[in-house]
Amino acid sequence: MFQDNPLLAQLKQQIHDSKEQVEGVVKSTDKAYGFLECDKKTYFIAPPSMKKVMHGDKIKATIEKQGDKEQAEPEALIEPMLTRFIAKVRFNKDKKLQVLVDHPSINQPIGAQQAKSVKEELQEGDWVVANLKTHPLRDDRFFYATINQFICRADDELAPWWVTLARHEQSRYPVQGAEHYEMLDQKTRENLTALHFVTIDSESTMDMDDALYIEPIAQNSTQTGWKLVVAIADPTAYIALDSQIEQEAKQRCFTNYLPGFNIPMLPRELSDELCSLIANETRPALVCYIETDLAGNITAKPHFVSAYVQSKAKLAYNKVSDYLEQADNAWQPETPETAQQIHWLHQFTKARIQWHKTHSLLFKEKPDYAFVLAENGKVQEIKAEYRRIANQIVEEAMIIANICAAQFLHEQAKTGIFNTHSGFDKKFLENAHHFLMANLANEQNQTELAERYSVENLATLNGYCQMRHDIEPIESDYLELRLRRYLTFAEFKSELAPHFGLGLEGYATWTSPIRKYSDMVNHRLIKAVLAKQPYEKTQNDVLARLQEARRQNRLVERDIADWLYCRYLAPKVAENVEFNAEVQDVMRGGLRVQLLENGASMFIPASTLHNNKEEMQVNSDEIALYIKGERTYKIGDIVKVKLTEVKEATRSIVGEILQ
């Protein structure tokens, strides 16, 4: 009788329409219920309704009220958490194929089918790529997925690499090379093979793309400065613009440096052989002559030439550093000419470091963390590697060469790929001003600092550098780390703009064309100017792809490292090991710290810091945790921690602070 009653249907619709409707993101818990997080409020989702949604789904919901209790009833899917995703294969008790999503907050198995293109016979625990095909809120059917790609077996020791590369849709293979390579640049090159160029790299480096030569400039038998000659490998001599290799490099943008091995941007026979500046082999190069005074100031316009060069020695960072630091039983240069080059480069570098202190910015010394791996990918140890003097020699030569390239491209080509950074995000300039005043101002300097750290001043390169020089001598990293959150991201641009992070008016990299596509583009522009050939302005799609590829590569490196840290630290839980750590972030849920010995990221749950949640407050302006009204922990603090748990499935390392 009531079945098709239009009045009843209308009444139901009116009741439904009168209910509050909200949009939000689903958050699951380790129980059957969940929550809907909306802009201003969080609503409970009951267990039966949670079966229709997944953690991370953006949905529309109606709010059901029972007395003073409210709960969200999912209505429609706005954006699913899952489209393409990484998963592990499982078979249920009826031997039906399912997938387990590789995500710390999603633990429900999803029914799946294997695409015909996937030929492997799937086994329990295999890693795969899947796509979500049906969703209960969208398709009126249960969750269901298709497996589109096999990644590797469950017991593959290299799973951290293969799974992470698949997650970020990056190839694990080098670019396919050509059958043979011909020199396309038949233009005249200067013969600079007589100059005593040297390369300085890691012992294991195969893709040497920079070589250095230096000599003093003298007037009336008195040294007045330096002439530095920077030779950079020239892969564009072999790569046609319309070639498949060019298209691949344009897509990859960078060589991917991963723990244990790299995946080159160019075919290995180019990156490691034909273009690499191997000792005693003649190679095509783009060369820049740079002149400075003894204080490191550039005194002449840079002079670029196409040339042939021949490195006379392949030197290693650690050996050169040991030699210059006069370590016991240190390596010695093989020839007096090489020794002379090392000493001159050392003197030049000291002058340039001093120049930075006055005219631009130097970075605070932080180590790189290197994984030492066995053949099978097992982590044997993790080394903290500090930048030593030989690293600084190469770094300073590359920085000055890139300053010169920016100047040349800006003046001669009016375009290029420039590395830029505009300092504080405009929307955070006020915050940065107030933070600096709160931490550095007192009664005596209040007026002076109000001017010095005014919003207008902090927005200029000079004002920003002045502020950085002010905080440089301060022992703690607190100011540095807090201010970092107010900064904008570095960007690639096609026109000259300052790089606040380096403290420079302009910066354009061209010194790593084997490893960076942006440097290949700048090579072509410099060579076109030299040859008086036409060229085009750098396209926005190239800049956008560079930006995205840089972000992807950093995520790949971080994700693999997180996984390897878990494998390395898991056996140490039973040993109750202790570490010194730096607080990196402060959240409601706890602290994120970095272990100083090996670089691993550890989570400290708030429940281990204090037993009364009501007495804990996070101050998001200071990035600090207050307990009973006292500031107890802040970003940059050094704390002693104990390792308590490692969960490899979610790549999480948990610890507690030792009071």
Curated annotation (Swiss-Prot):
| Cellular localisation | Cytoplasm
Residue ranges occupied by any S1 motif domain in the UniProt entry: 576-658
Q: Which SMART domains match?
A: CSP (SM00357), RNB (SM00955), S1 (SM00316)
Top-level enzyme category: hydrolase
Per the record, its GO cellular-component terms are:
cytosol
- Principal localisation: cytoplasm
Q: Which SUPFAM superfamilies does this entry report, sorted A to Z? A: Nucleic acid-binding proteins
Listed under GO biological process in this entry are: mRNA catabolic process
Q: What does the record give as the reaction this protein catalyses? A: Exonucleolytic cleavage in the 3'- to 5'-direction to yield nucleoside 5'-phosphates
Q: Does the keyword Lipid metabolism apply?
A: no
Function text: Involved in mRNA degradation. Hydrolyzes single-stranded polyribonucleotides processively in the 3' to 5' direction.
Give the family this protein belongs to, as stated in its UniProt record.
Answer: Belongs to the RNR ribonuclease family. RNase II subfamily.
Name under which the protein is recorded: Exoribonuclease 2
- Organism per entry: Haemophilus influenzae (strain 86-028NP)
Lineage of the species this protein comes from: Bacteria, Pseudomonadati, Pseudomonadota, Gammaproteobacteria, Pasteurellales
Q: What gene does this protein come from?
A: rnb
